[in-house]
């Protein structure tokens, strides 16, 4: 378990508890989780070593128009990594469900409400794009960039998180390259439910040992943290052990409850070049 899994800030979350599903608009359903919980554990100061954002895709977004006709859309939300809070995913789902039987004058009104409520919960302005299904149908399914490190003939017997697996992992020639793995799996901090993801790592620095990196990523398999926290841990561990001159970590997780979360952290870039689905999304 994470060192902060029993933090008082988590005690009031609806996650892991039986809840009622509201169908009338209610922004009070949103629940924040302070980013400081895991950042204190990572010994991060107010001056963060990364930029970035958390990109959410909202697949179950529906409301009624003024005539009572249901509307459906797909939403894309970007929450800055500098925000005080991340948004707990079950509360996000419950909040979106509260739109289901509520009448709104226009799609713009829905988008404006989303921006206002999510920004208030995160503690910083978020961006929201509400798309029609026709718009989203044109979006391609893509793969991650660079070299996949998954097809290695190695034996693994331990699945407990171990950052020291990166010790000495970067001792090769200086390179600029992109690596990725589809074997990232961790567990929800509260419910222990599995979270499945793919992760792309772009860096400039001493060449990283593929076996060491894969063993490290697999060691998250029984680790309990939220998606955003895992990605920040990967970023800080690679910076600490491998000391690249530049680093970007971009994970795309499979959806749960009609939402997927795609955290992006970079030493030099505030947002990814794309927000396109992977095969498992």
UniProtKB/Swiss-Prot annotation:
The keyword NADP belongs to this UniProt entry's keyword annotation: yes
UniProt key word Oxidoreductase: yes
Gene3D superfamilies from the UniProt entry: 3.30.1130.10
Keywords assigned: Cytoplasm, NADP, Oxidoreductase, Queuosine biosynthesis
Subcellular location: Cytoplasm
Compositional bias annotation for Polar residues: 264-281
Residues where substrate binds: 87-89, 227-228
SUPFAM superfamilies attached to this UniProt entry: Tetrahydrobiopterin biosynthesis enzymes-like
Pfam families per UniProt: QueF (PF14489), QueF_N (PF14819)
Chief place where the protein resides: cytoplasm
Residues noted as binding NADPH in the record, renumbered to the chain: 89-90, 256-257
CC per GO annotation: cytosol
Sample GO molecular function, one term: preQ1 synthase activity
Pathway: tRNA modification; tRNA-queuosine biosynthesis
Active-site residue list: 188 (thioimide intermediate), 195 (proton donor)
Record region (Disordered): 262-281
EC number per UniProt: 1.7.1.13
Catalysed reaction equations from the record: 7-aminomethyl-7-carbaguanine + 2 NADP(+) = 7-cyano-7-deazaguanine + 2 NADPH + 3 H(+)
Biological process, per Gene Ontology: queuosine biosynthetic process; tRNA modification
Subunit structure: Homodimer.
Family: Belongs to the GTP cyclohydrolase I family. QueF type 2 subfamily.
Functional summary from the UniProt entry: Catalyzes the NADPH-dependent reduction of 7-cyano-7-deazaguanine (preQ0) to 7-aminomethyl-7-deazaguanine (preQ1).
Protein name per Swiss-Prot or TrEMBL: NADPH-dependent 7-cyano-7-deazaguanine reductase
Originating species: Vibrio cholerae serotype O1 (strain ATCC 39315 / El Tor Inaba N16961)
